[in-house]
UniProtKB/Swiss-Prot annotation:
Alphabetized UniProt keyword annotations: Amidation, Neuropeptide, Secreted
Family: Belongs to the FARP (FMRFamide related peptide) family.
Lineage start: Eukaryota, Metazoa, Ecdysozoa, Arthropoda, Hexapoda
Keyword Lyase applies: no
Phenylalanine amide found at: F9
Record has Secreted as a keyword: yes
Subcellular localization(s) per the UniProt record: Secreted
Primary residence: secreted
Source domain of life: Eukaryota
GO cellular component: extracellular region
Protein name in the entry: FMRFamide-4
Biological processes annotated in GO: neuropeptide signaling pathway
Length: 9
């Protein structure tokens, strides 16, 4: 998973 995947909150 990319960093942007985790920032989707």
């Amino acid at each position: 998973a990319s960093n942007q995947d985790f920032m989707r909150f």
